[in-house]
Design a protein with these regions (language model features):
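Short amphipathic alpha-helical interaction segments
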Residues: 368-383
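Conserved double-stranded beta-helix
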Residues: 187, 233-293
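Active-site region of the double-stranded beta-helix
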Residues: 1-11, 24-193, 201-251
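Acidic, low-complexity/disordered tracts enriched in E/D and polar residues
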Residues: 267-351, 379, 390-398
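Short acidic, hydrophobic short linear motifs in intrinsically disordered regions
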Residues: 342-369
Length: 398
């Protein structure tokens, strides 16, 4: 089966498993790198963290550093090399392309290499993330099944019979997932084969000889994580939500007062939650660098309390210096620039402003400059350590 990107996204992503076979030369160029064309070359050049285990004896894996992958492989162990992105040029860009293709936030994808000796692999488990397995060397079988007991699992990998993490309990009030209740399908993987497994797919593997594959794993934040992150930023702006529930763990009148306080908080919650937008949620997943690359009129900023903008007139222009303080209390100059006459008013305003503000509000207060110029000034002061780009909308707008 050969699928176009549109066909895959329309009919399979993110909830249906699918696979396709083809030649290695159809794969992205980074996956055709010489180091990934030879297990000997990979184990000789890889210097990062290694997780190893033996599916013949159980699901347990151990992660170590500063060890020879080749030595572990000769001991009959299956290996997972988690840091190949440092070794293979172009893998970082490939991950960003994968994220963009499915509308996932930057940084949520990772890639690792699996090496397994003959008749080994991984024991039956399910992952709480989307997985693309790409076979590069050798052959192996995937046995997969749609997990019936728990839709959209959250948290970590679940291995039946292993110690269960706490977040699985509220997800499994009807009983924990059981692979014995599922019907498995065998997928034959050859060099060039690609398998997509939605989160929650039961799977185990068996190799037919020495095998090398890579997995591209996407872990976008769940709705729970995204909404709670956005909601937290709004609640922290309200002193009523910052106040502890004093007396809640006490008795009598103390607990009654805490219960009244809690009731009032819950009554205010719908209005606060209804004010959230998808953009509020999106912003929580971006790094500061991502936000810097996408500044716009609705971007918000605040002066860092540990930084100072010093302004000195020099004829018809002004010199601006940013002085910042590090975690050890040391002060140092982070940037210096000459400010032309039309921008002096903006810099004077920025040197005195302490409340959060948007790029649009700053531009409206200084209409002599176009918005694009305001954004360039803001970005320069962000990079200089004077301004903090905010990941939330202030309730009191400036």
């Amino acid at each position: 089966m050969q699928l176009s990107e549109d066909e895959f996204k329309t009919h399979y992503w993110p909830d249906r498993a699918c696979w396709s076979d083809g030649k290695l030369d159809r794969l992205p160029k980074p996956l055709q790198h010489p180091v990934l064309s030879s297990i000997d070359a990979l184990t000789a050049n890889y210097k990062g963290r290694v997780s190893f285990g033996n599916a013949k004896t159980g699901s347990r894996t151990v992660a170590v550093e500063h060890i020879s992958p080749d030595m572990l492989l000769k001991m009959g162990l299956s290996l997972y090399l988690t840091e190949i992105v440092r070794l293979i040029p172009g893998l970082t860009e490939l991950l960003r392309e994968a994220e963009s293709a499915v509308g996932a936030p930057p940084g949520c994808a990772r890639i690792g290499a699996f090496i397994a000796p003959e008749e080994n692999g991984v024991t039956c488990h399910m992952d709480a993330e989307e997985v693309f397995s790409i076979q590069l060397i050798g052959e192996k079988r995937f046995f997969i099944s749609k997990q019936k007991g728990l839709e959209q699992p959250f948290g970590m990998q679940f291995n039946p019979g292993d110690v269960t993490y706490d977040d699985m309990y509220p997800q499994s009030t009807a009983g924990f997932p059981d692979p014995d209740a599922s019907e498995f399908e065998c997928v034959e993987m050859k060099p060039g084969s690609v398998l997509f497994m939605p989160r929650g797919t039961w799977h185990r593997t068996e190799t037919r000889g020495l095998s090398l594959s890579v997995s591209i794993i996407l872990r976008p934040p769940s709705a729970v994580e995204s909404v709670l992150d956005a909601l937290r930023a709004r609640l922290l702006q309200d002193s009523a939500w910052r106040r502890p529930l004093h007396g809640a763990w006490g008795q009598g009148s103390e607990r009654i007062a805490a219960d009244q306080q809690f009731t009032q908080l819950l009554e205010s919650l719908p209005d606060i939650a209804n004010g959230l937008t998808l953009e509020d949620v999106r912003q929580t997943a971006y790094s500061e660098n991502d936000r810097n690359e996408n500044l716009g009129p609705e971007s918000y900023f605040q002066v860092k309390p540990e930084s100072t903008l010093k302004l000195t007139m020099k004829g018809q222009s002004m010199q601006a210096k940013v002085i910042a303080r590090d975690v050890d209390g040391r002060e140092f100059e982070t940037m210096q620039l000459d400010v032309p006459l039309p921008m002096i008013g903006v810099f004077e305003w920025l040197s005195h402003t302490r409340h959060a503000f948007s790029a649009a509000s700053m531009a409206q207060s200084h209409e002599g400059l176009p918005l694009e110029q305001h954004l360039r000034i803001l970005l320069a002061l962000v990079k200089g350590g004077y301004l903090k780009p905010l990941w939330y909308r202030p309730l009191v707008k400036g």
